[in-house]
Curated annotation (Swiss-Prot):
This is Ribosomal RNA large subunit methyltransferase E. It comes from Shewanella frigidimarina (strain NCIMB 400). The gene is rlmE. S-adenosyl-L-methionine binds at G63, W65, D83, D99, D124. It catalyses: uridine(2552) in 23S rRNA + S-adenosyl-L-methionine = 2'-O-methyluridine(2552) in 23S rRNA + S-adenosyl-L-homocysteine + H(+). It is an enzyme of class 2 (transferase).
């Protein structure tokens, strides 16, 4: 991508961002990001998170999903969040800053989970986009594979998984892999997801491995 094209694309994104209904609504409601509405829509349809549950939130910053999850789990629940970027504190959220791809960060996250089993694993992770599909798609698929591996390590039987996936090479095979681990797998495209985005969310329930 040339500098001129990148600048035009960035300018368009900024204009869309500030004109965006969900951005304005997030600001009005005191939510960290418009992404919070994606999880709210998924929750409304699939009822993944309940009071008292333990939730792991991968790719959490700036905290939109963690805010929603903490509210749903309540005082007796627990949200353990991780991101390579910093995140301001949220009541009820135990945040670990670090690169989830690194073993030492994974181990630190597993220590936060402890002996407890996790009820829900959430992943809104995405790589830094270069603009080249040949580069970005493999990076994105690597992250969702790591998120699924996290499920295998911490998820309770009949637990749930919601993960952002970009449609493209590896997408169909990934769905097949997720279906091997969960009883029900649905594809969601929340209204708050930008129409031109290739992102969709896989919502998997009934962990069976």
């Amino acid at each position: 991508m040339t500098t001129k094209k990148r600048t035009a694309s960035s300018t368009r994104w900024m204009q869309e961002h500030f004109d965006d209904h969900y951005v304005k609504l997030a600001q009005k409601r005191g939510l960290r990001s418009r992404a919070a509405f994606k999880l709210e829509e998924i929750q409304e349809k699939d009822h993944l998170i309940k009071q008292g549950m333990t939730v792991v939130d991968l790719g959490a910053a700036p905290g939109g999903w963690s805010q929603v999850a903490a509210k749903l789990t309540g005082d007796k629940g627990k949200v353990i969040a991780c991101d390579i970027l910093p995140m301001d504190p949220i009541v009820g959220v135990d945040f670990l800053q670090g690169d989830f791809r690194e073993d030492k960060v994974l181990q630190a996250l597993l220590e936060r989970v402890g002996q407890d089993k996790v009820d829900v694993v959430l992943s809104d992770m995405a790589p830094n986009m270069s603009g080249s599909g040949a580069v970005d798609q493999p990076r994105a698929m690597y992250l969702v594979e790591l998120a699924l591996d996290m499920c295998h390590q911490v998820l309770t039987p009949n637990g749930c998984f919601a993960v952002k996936v970009f449609q493209g090479e590896g997408f169909d095979d990934y769905i097949k892999t997720v279906k091997q681990a969960f009883k029900v797998v649905k594809t969601r495209k929340p209204d708050s997801s930008r129409a031109r985005s290739r992102e969709v969310y896989l919502v998997a329930t009934g962990y069976k491995l």
